[in-house]
């Protein structure tokens, strides 16, 4: 489908972003090479912008607040997922702006279309950690928690925009230009906090750790019509693909699903 505005809920505020000092204590980056950790949006972006990754904070629309409160007690319904996507909707222009802020040209000129992981389903989608049983949680950790890239069969990159709107922590690993790993973390987003949005691209090697018991993430991805998640690819520092970026800090991961390339 073409990326256009999803009709917003009545009374929903536009999802404006800002560099909010109140997020200073919930976003941070630690480095695998032992350099000092950094905290706060500005410092995080100084570390991650060189690899095309950018972080902003986002005002919570009033219409979304009852959903976020409910997410602390139970898994949300499919209809509530749709309402949450509408509340945090991003138009094609807004998605392109996220890439621009990260210093990237879009993977597909003009932004392309809402993409989907082959065999998994299309974006946008909601990751609701309260909805995961132990078997599913293990599969999610084993799949997304290892370093990987996302690309179409012809090698086309994708653009990804993830907004943590409740709960956590949520963690990502990114490969820096020198081959070290930057471990980005969004600590728990509370009901009175702003959401945190991160933009990155699929061929920038990364991993995502969603091991919290409660949390909501609204995910957009765009570019080609479909992509595949890969643990083997001709990219810089390819020897890191499939590895666990949190192994040296004592976090173990389940086995990798065999169907992932």
Indicate where each model-derived feature is located.
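Active-site region of the double-stranded beta-helix
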Residues: 48-50, 54-191, 210-261
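Conserved SET/PR-domain catalytic core that frames the SAM/AdoMet-binding pocket
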Residues: 189-206
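Bacterial N-terminal signal peptides that target proteins for export
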Residues: 1-8
